[in-house]
UniProtKB/Swiss-Prot annotation:
Residues reported to bind ATP: 40-47
Protein name: Energy-coupling factor transporter ATP-binding protein EcfA2
Main location: membrane
Provenance organism: Listeria innocua serovar 6a (strain ATCC BAA-680 / CLIP 11262)
EC class: translocase
Amino acid sequence: MEIKLEQLGYCYQKNSPFEKRALLDVNVSFDSGSYSAIIGHTGSGKSTLLQHLNALLMPTEGKITVGDREIVAGVKQKKLRDLRKKVGIVFQFPEAQLFEETVEKDICFGPMNFGVSEEDAKLRAKKVIYEVGLTEEILSRSPFELSGGQMRRVAIAGVLAMDPEVLVLDEPTAGLDPHGREEIMEMFYNLHKEKGLTTVLVTHSMEDAARYAEKIVLMKAGTVLKIGSPREIFAKPDELVDLGLSVPDVVRFQGLFERKFNVKLTKTCLTIAELTAEMAPYLAKGGA
């Protein structure tokens, strides 16, 4: 499912003394089946933008098109349930939203709220619990008896049970250790490939943006500053640092190597294998 934002703008508490501009003239598209990342410093508008993708927020200017559904600023919208079934959002610390007596009931809540029968919802719960790396026996347990990592997977299963076509991830690994973060990100990537999802990742992790995204949207102060492939975005690391962002370790090490040997490698490397191959000729002859 394709998503397109055209001249999108948003103000909190518009036409009040407390009006605050959050988004201005945002133009970006996410192709069907693509994996994109949105990066930017805190307050750049990333989370506000993502809440427009399933109409949790409505634009105050411009429009957004999700599949065949068009949402135009100032036009009253009907039947947003259909849109919200198609666009699933995993927020930061999604486990905080768990509330039911059992894992099964928690996973079934979303689908049943959108009209799925209890029987079908339970079948979905059995399916998605395996997709998030857990087993069926956990369905009868209280979510509050689980570990933090298991609770997060259960919360994610609740989103997947809606059978979305678009998956929006808002810092989905916040608070996890490096191993847990890698496991969750690999799980999302596998789901993206297996289900043909359109995936949009909001992240502060430049490593994740470089590793998984086909396209990166760089935001600053509510506007889109730059759109490009990971190689294009990280080709000028100093610009990102000036914005208060980090760069992937491989990119940082490449910069150190280029300065030390006064050389310019032929491309911006995103993996250790790429960087090793690029450095090899210089190391073989002891420097440039």
